[in-house]
Amino acid sequence: MAKTLYEKLFDAHVVYEAENETPLLYIDRHLVHEVTSPQAFDGLRAHGRPVRQPGKTFATMDHNVSTQTKDINACGEMARIQMQELIKNCKEFGVELYDLNHPYQGIVHVMGPEQGVTLPGMTIVCGDSHTATHGAFGALAFGIGTSEVEHVLATQTLKQGRAKTMKIEVQGKAAPGITAKDIVLAIIGKTGSAGGTGHVVEFCGEAIRDLSMEGRMTLCNMAIEMGAKAGLVAPDETTFNYVKGRLHAPKGKDFDDAVAYWKTLQTDEGATFDTVVTLQAEEIAPQVTWGTNPGQVISVNDNIPDPASFADPVERASAEKALAYMGLKPGIPLTEVAIDKVFIGSCTNSRIEDLRAAAEIAKGRKVAPGVQALVVPGSGPVKAQAEAEGLDKIFIEAGFEWRLPGCSMCLAMNNDRLNPGERCASTSNRNFEGRQGRGGRTHLVSPAMAAAAAVTGHFADIRNIK
């Protein structure tokens, strides 16, 4: 029987399945951070259980680390306690930890792929909703809750029901300057923020194959923002070339054998999906969200929509509420909307290619008066690479702040946050009310678009910036 990529990955990991019971899946990799793990380790301790597979468990600090200092006390008492607990727990249970002073420390979904922890064909979990990022490698990756974190630590397995399948095909080639962020925002604009609920999404089509691994990670990172359980891109030569030579990747003949298997991780011809969505890449312009969920998104050259134009009463009410919160009026061109802050970072867009794209816009320009712009690399290796290329100097000369790695203003768990009423052009993944700070207003954009907003003081079409 013809199978989708998701079905192949799921079936290959079923440990046990009884009639009328939820299947038990084997978990290949478990990524851990300081926020969702303390109670899980406490549970192990209370029952006298070890970590079943410490060699398949990797930890880092990211959510509430300071991006201005490596001082563990810098972001308040709760942050300090969570980080100290992670140090204690990893030491006690034999888990490898990339702490504040480790050169590999960074956002968990940046660290995993760049260290070769993430490989095609794997099941990967983390107590974090954006674990879907790792699906870019053709791995089944999804977020779990703290009780499930404990279960995986104890057993290296997890009960998981089968999801429905969705194919999202982006046909043709994207125009110059159009990034994975624009593509995924356009997709969510079409499906809505709940369009993928109950599904695992496979992204395919020429525009997807053209993306680098970093672009594919951006794409899969935001699968969760359309309500999907996970996002997938089938592995190909782009994937294999990225993985080869990384710290935890197979070496020599083992790598060749792995690639031979990874090449089978494609959806079979004739396999059926529960839902199919198609977009034309050439129709996608730079995207900017205007509301309070990622599905409320338009092209940069469009006007803010009028809630009255929505036929669905629920959508209309949502749009009215969003515009009130965002302090926007219908009919205003997006390019006339001024911004206060810019955040370039997060597990969506903090990799080296993202920083290069932003630096290209920043080079030779200055951050607009009254705008604060932060650049937060996703990990120690990304920061080191950017500095080796001189990107930090470009940003600093333009008036951007060059920070240490961490999740930062994406979710405002450290000291990087918006004040009430402040408007931010952000490369992160969520524009919910209060996400970047109480009363803060978030617009999601690509790194180049964020840099353009920083230097112009308002949203600007990067296609017009020479």
From Swiss-Prot:
Gene expressing this chain: leuC
InterPro entries: 3-IsopropMal_deHydase_lsu, Acnase/IPM_dHydase_lsu_aba_1/3, Acoase/IPM_deHydtase_lsu_aba, Aconitase_4Fe-4S_BS, Aconitase_4Fe-4S_dom, IPM_dehydratase_rel_enz, IPMI_cat
EC number(s) on file: 4.2.1.33
Keywords: 4Fe-4S, Amino-acid biosynthesis, Branched-chain amino acid biosynthesis, Iron, Iron-sulfur, Leucine biosynthesis, Lyase, Metal-binding
Subunit structure: Heterodimer of LeuC and LeuD.
Pathway, per record: Amino-acid biosynthesis; L-leucine biosynthesis; L-leucine from 3-methyl-2-oxobutanoate: step 2/4
Annotated function: Catalyzes the isomerization between 2-isopropylmalate and 3-isopropylmalate, via the formation of 2-isopropylmaleate.
Protein name: 3-isopropylmalate dehydratase large subunit
GO term, biological process aspect, one: L-leucine biosynthetic process
Reactions performed catalytically: (2R,3S)-3-isopropylmalate = (2S)-2-isopropylmalate
Enzyme category, top tier: lyase
Species of origin: Escherichia fergusonii (strain ATCC 35469 / DSM 13698 / CCUG 18766 / IAM 14443 / JCM 21226 / LMG 7866 / NBRC 102419 / NCTC 12128 / CDC 0568-73)
Family classification: Belongs to the aconitase/IPM isomerase family. LeuC type 1 subfamily.
NCBIfam families xref list: leuC, PRK05478.1, PRK12466.1
Residues reported to bind [4Fe-4S] cluster: C347, C407, C410
Requisite cofactors: [4Fe-4S] cluster
Keyword match Cell membrane: no
Pfam families referenced in this protein's UniProt entry, alphabetically: Aconitase (PF00330)
GO MF annotation terms: 3-isopropylmalate dehydratase activity; 4 iron, 4 sulfur cluster binding; metal ion binding
Binding note for cofactor: Binds 1 [4Fe-4S] cluster per subunit.
